[in-house]
């Protein structure tokens, strides 16, 4: 029985390396239900999906995640392999991140395990990114460099 939903975090907690597969761009035909079913038995600890340079395809991502669920569980007992998405927005400033926080909400709503901010130019941009990933009810770190989370809960 897995300790966590996210196998990559499990491995890191055990001081183990993690290995990924995936591309930084995808053809528009990749994010499908059938590909998700196929990838449910993948060898890698996580699957990287590049939306920084690839298409921002939420319909495809949702179908892909459904395929992963239906094709699972993984050989390690996880419901799906870990899926991490490269966020298309650049972290040039906190303002740019906040204006584009809708991308974070859309990606996380599809059931992925994590988001990678590929570039950040300041600590403030990183804080804004973390805030955009968190619900308001999660107050750990608020007042210590973080403001309230901006994701809605209803």
Model-found features: residue ranges?
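Expand to "…catalyze enediolate/carbanion chemistry for C-C bond making/breaking, isomerization
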Residues: 1-154
């Amino acid at each position: 029985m897995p300790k966590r939903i996210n196998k990559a975090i499990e491995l890191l907690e055990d001081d183990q390396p993690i290995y990924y597969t995936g591309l930084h761009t995808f053809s528009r035909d990749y994010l499908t239900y059938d590909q998700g079913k196929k990838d449910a038995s993948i060898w890698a600890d996580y699957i990287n999906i590049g939306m920084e340079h690839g298409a921002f395809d939420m319909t495809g991502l949702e179908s892909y995640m459904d395929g992963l669920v239906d094709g699972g569980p993984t050989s390690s007992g996880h419901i799906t392999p870990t899926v991490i998405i490269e966020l298309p927005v650049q972290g040039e400033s906190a303002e740019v991140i906040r204006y584009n926080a809708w991308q974070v909400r859309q990606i996380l709503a599809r059931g992925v395990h994590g988001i990678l901010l590929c570039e950040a130019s300041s600590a403030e941009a990183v804080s804004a990114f973390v805030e955009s990933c968190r619900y308001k009810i999660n107050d750990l770190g608020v007042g210590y460099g973080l403001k309230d989370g901006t994701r809605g809960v209803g």
